[in-house]
A protein has these predicted regions:
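Catalytic metal-binding acidic patch
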Residues: 429-437
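Mg2+/Mn2+-dependent nuclease catalytic core
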Residues: 451-485
């Protein structure tokens, strides 16, 4: 990353040093300045100030000054809190206590009642919340900040004896107001850096408006769809046979609980895998699920065994690495796999949060924040954990290596179940993942891109860019080749030697949930949810969280035979996106900076959980599920 940034810096400096750089070249340089946060670099900032007679440069500098000052104000607040502790280890210990106390209070669990400070959890956009899921999304913001704070403590590398001190607990509580603000600031800065918010200033007020950004709206819709599906699955009544039928091989020693059954089911869906014994990062999928399950069980047992918290230290669980290793092995995980899992579960500088890596190294032991561990959903934590692990120089991209083949296979099965012949077409170095024909003479050539779900704005921007640029370029060459060499398509699909398509439709299909339909020149870019729902004739439905009863929404495009026109109409306006877009609302978030009011205007999706007869319910958008095809 540093090498890339240095290369970009050299290129940008060369462009800015030109006395009369072309407008397009200057605009490109300014985009790189924002994307790589080079505006905070003294060398780049100095060159920009020499060109401040240019309007775009001046506006960038004015905006950047605000973000740099806001970042500094947050850093100063964090530093001021840290000054009240004897060491970083001291601060880490008391911050973990505060976080556990906060989570217990939120979840209605036993707390230590003798703290001087009462913990109140508030978020900047609470006025918009419609249900607990909206609150939960903001808790994710807080968890991000807490994990960011942890990483800074761990990097200090200190080991010393620490003990509870009420004044230090009070000081650690000051991190809480920062939690949501810090994470929200980071996201708003990222939105601006990607050119999706324009700043305006008037006297002591600065406004950054991203409410009209289609890209931001798409990200919000994508994330809302993801939250809705995950929330819906977590309440989905499920039994052992339901999952046993969805996998070709059972996990180690069967299932320990219904919770593990759900985790196994959701893992098969997220990883497009029919075999939970597939290996990833040194352990099988079922072993990762079992290890997360064991950590949750240890956390639950710790909380249950302490109905009254007599001492603050009891809030946390301190154990050696050997303890957790032994627990994993006792649960049926081979020693070698258990060692790999323990290494990945240990929180470090690259960890995203403690839901993925729940074991925090502290003074030679591993500390578990029990209530946070209870919130772990193994399927989602494993996906997030894998995203945080960067592949080595000679290692294949895990998403491509692991998700891709299963995703392609299931896409072809969706079509086969609809009575449509679908095949992979290969010749020499050309490879079309899925080819099929509708109405006898309309050929569809599909490129499948297996990707993890995106949960932050930058990742979503990169996803859309990859699909619309890199994937399109690759698929264009593939389509051009096979359209010129139809014999290979005829052979794989069993078509007559003289068969010629009346037209060819090019489709890029991704496993990640999108927030809008993209039509890139001659390509449709859609996600598997839209594809599966159409060909499986699955209509949008709403299900109360407490039952299996569903209310279906009529969709004439899903009635009658499968036609080309109906499929195109569905791709143009999929209900999974159009319905979610109805939840978009504009909002304003405010920060104060040295007597100035900084306002961020954007959009957010609220209310994935709907109210029906006073009963919480969730929209159910059909999506490819492995158990349908086993």
């Amino acid at each position: 990353m540093k090498r890339t940034r240095e290369k970009v810096k050299e290129k940008v400096m060369a462009a800015l040093e030109l006395p009369s750089a072309p407008a397009e070249e200057l605009a490109a340089a300014l985009r790189e300045v924002k994307l790589h946060r080079l505006y905070a670099d003294p060398d780049i900032a100095g060159l920009l100030r020499k060109r401040d007679e240019v309007r775009d440069v001046r506006e960038l500098l004015d905006d950047a000054d605000i973000f740099v000052a806001l970042d500094r104000s947050f850093t100063d607040r964090i530093t001021a809190i840290g000054a009240r502790f004897d060491s970083r280890s001291d601060e880490l210990y008391h911050t973990m206590l505060v976080h556990e106390q906060q989570l217990r209070s939120t979840c209605g669990l036993p707390t230590y009642e003798h703290f001087n400070t009462s913990i109140v959890v508030e978020f900047l956009d609470e006025g918009h919340y419609k249900n607990p899921l909206d609150f939960g999304a903001s808790v994710d913001y807080a968890m991000s900040y807490f994990s960011l704070t942890l990483r800074s403590f761990l990097e200090a590398g200190e080991r010393m004896s620490v003990h509870y001190d009420s004044a230090k607990f009070d000081a650690a509580c000051l991190h809480l107001p920062l939690s949501g603000e810090w994470a929200i600031f980071h996201e708003r800065r990222s939105i601006w850096e990607h050119g999706q918010a324009r700043g305006t200033r008037h006297e002591n007020v600065a406004v950054f408006d991203a409410s009209g950004s289609e890209l931001l709206s798409a990200f919000r819709v994508s994330l809302s769809r993801l939250r809705g599906v995950r929330q819906g699955e977590s309440f989905n009544p499920m039994t052992h046979p339901a999952v046993a039928g969805s996998t070709r091989k059972l996990p180690i020693d069967g299932f320990r609980s219904n919770d593990e059954v759900k985790s196994a089911y959701m893992t098969t869906q997220q990883f497009y895998s029919e075999d939970l014994r597939e290996e990833v990062r040194g352990a099988r999928l079922c072993e990762w699920i079992r290890a997360y399950t064991v950590v949750k069980e240890i956390a639950k047992q710790h909380i249950a065994s302490h109905p009254l918290i007599g001492q603050p230290a009891t809030l946390l669980l301190h154990k050696t690495a050997d303890f957790f290793l032994a627990e994993f092995v006792a649960a049926g995980i081979p020693v070698k796999s258990a060692g790999q899992i323990l290494r990945r579960f240990t929180f470090n500088a690259s960890s995203k949060d403690i839901l993925d890596a729940p074991l925090i190294p502290f003074n030679g032991e591993l500390v578990l924040v029990p209530t946070a561990a209870m919130l772990i959903e193994p399927a989602f934590s494993l996906e997030s954990l894998l995203k945080s692990i960067r592949s080595g120089k000679d290692e294949p991209n895990h998403e491509l290596q692991f998700i891709g083949p299963g995703f392609e296979k299931l896409t072809r099965r969706v079509l086969a179940d609809a009575g449509i012949v679908a095949r992979k077409v290969k010749h020499k170095n050309r490879d079309c993942d899925v080819a099929f024909v509708l109405e006898d003479d309309v050929l569809f050539l599909c490129e499948c891109k297996g990707r993890f779900q995106t949960s932050d704005f930058r990742s979503y921007v990169e996803l859309e860019a990859e699909l619309g640029r890199d994937a399109a370029q690759q698929h264009r060459k593939t389509c051009d080749y096979f359209e010129s060499h139809l014999a290979h398509v005829r052979d794989r699909l069993g078509l007559a030697p003289t068969w010629v398509p009346s037209r060819v439709m090019r489709v890029i299909l991704t496993s990640a949930k999108l927030g809008r339909v993209r039509f890139n020149e001659d390509f449709y870019v859609i996600d598997e949810n839209m594809f599966y729902a159409f060909f499986a004739r699955k209509k949008l439905s709403m299900r109360p969280l407490s039952s299996r009863r569903r209310t279906f929404v009529h969709d004439p495009r899903l009635d009658g035979p499968i036609t080309v026109d109906a499929f195109i109409a569905y791709m143009d306006d999929p209900p999974s996106i159009s319905r979610t877009r109805m939840l978009l609302e504009e909002r304003e978030l405010h920060f104060e900076l040295e007597g100035r009011m900084i306002t961020f205007k954007d959009v957010e999706c609220y209310g994935e959980l709907l109210k029906e007869h006073k009963e919480s319910a969730v929209w159910t958008f059909p999506g490819t599920t492995v158990h349908h095809y086993s």
